Amino acid sequence: MAIQWPTWSAIAPTLVLGLTALLLFVVDSISPDSTNRGLLSGIATVGSLVALGITGWFLSAGTGNETITLYNGALVVDTMSLFFVLIFTSVTALVSVASYDYLRDHAYQAEYYALVVLAATGMTLMASANSLAVVFVSLELASLPSYALVAILKKNRGSVEAGLKYFLIGALSSAIFAYGISLVYGVTGSLRLPQVASALAGSGWESVSGVLGVGVLMVLGGFAFKTASVPFHFWAPEAYEGAPAPVSAFLSSASKAAGFALAFRVFVEGFPLGAAASAGIDWALLFQILAVATMVLGNFAAATQEKVKRMLAYSSIGHAGYVLIGLAALSAEASTNGDVMGAAMAHLLVYGFMNTGAFLFVAMAENWGVGRRF
């Protein structure tokens, strides 16, 4: 007889990551001055691998073939969310392993690993968010630990300065994003993406189409920050250069993929192109402009850099433009949208691992004494 698992078990990878972060905090509370990097790195790595294994099992068993809805529609688990969770957990495990030697004799190791796992927890929630409220909370859960991770090298002025700039730009983008959500809620009367889409499919939007358009534009700005897309890309070169190399790898791959997971979910499910166009909002055109600007600026700027981290940062911005093509190429006819989204997701998968490898090689060079040392 088949085992009937409870519905909440569909978010088991998220729960495992959350429990792993709590365990790291417990270890830190018992031994605040602990530098047992083997234990700390092992806990973070094992927790990430367990979450990765559960996600792979779900995908192989076809768990996401039929959408699973949890908590009254606030979260959904489907193939797309599991695909992105697979990326997040894989990158988290790689970063945790790479940090073992990189953080030798460095303080705040327990906090470092806990912040990495907490950020990954927020990213898994971002992939499953089906409500604008959950979208905002999960985005902040992923962003707040990232600010601290960038500035964790307290004795390094570049790290602290990069973390401060990242935080200030992130706070501004969060405020813009939250205000955009409030405008969308005020017009549609709902925060859940299916209800927002149903409201947009109705009629009588002429008097409030401007307010709704501004709200959608502000929401798009929040995603542009998270994915380091033009014109919200200014934080990326500073943050990637000042942060520890494993953190740069984490931000450039997992964090960027999380931003696109949210964008795919919100704009495809919450603001369907056909319904949005009938309300006078052509967000595909906005993504087309963003894609062109991001690709051009990112790649041309990368070609002029003399520092490896800044070059990789601008290259990461350029790759964000490539993925934006996936949103820019969507049409009101849904027959080809699946192929377009699949291509964008495949690019994120390959890019995520390749860019993680590039930054981890930089971490090895720094650890060997070629670059910065603690």
Q: Could you tell me what each predicted segment is?
A:
Residues 1-374:
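Alpha-helical transmembrane segments of multi-pass membrane proteins predominantly involved
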